[in-house]
């Protein structure tokens, strides 16, 4: 498990402009896509706020992805 700190940002939208994917943008300009759908709504309520998320990180050819196990607002 790894913890990352950053800001919750939108990462993709549907054809109507609705946010369908979130990411965490870190201080070192990395972006981690949020994989965990169950947490999507809760993290969406923290859009543009600083958080700490803990979970499993994996890398694809194009993206870093985190499966979030827990999160909290950054103090």
Segments predicted by a language model, with ranges:
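Short, surface-exposed secondary-structure junctions/capping segments
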Residues: 22, 49-60
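OB-fold/S1-family single-stranded nucleic acid-binding modules
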Residues: 58-75
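Short aromatic-glycine-enriched beta-strand elements
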Residues: 14-24
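Short nucleic-acid-contacting surface segments enriched for D/E, G, S/T with interspersed K/R
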Residues: 38-54
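Structural detector for short beta-strands of small beta-barrel domains
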Residues: 1-16, 48, 55
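Domain-length accessory/inserted modules outside core catalytic folds
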Residues: 21-23, 41, 47, 70, ...
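A short macromolecule-binding patch
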Residues: 30-35
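Acidic/polar residues in short coil/turn loops that connect beta-strands
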Residues: 26-28
């Amino acid at each position: 498990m790894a913890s990352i700190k950053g800001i919750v940002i939108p990462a993709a939208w549907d054809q109507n402009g609705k946010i369908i994917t979130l990411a965490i943008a870190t201080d070192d300009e990395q972006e981690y896509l949020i994989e965990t759908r169950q947490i999507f709504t809760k993290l969406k309520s923290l859009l543009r706020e600083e958080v700490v998320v803990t979970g499993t990180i994996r890398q694809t050819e194009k993206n870093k992805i985190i499966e979030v196990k827990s999160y909290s607002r950054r103090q």
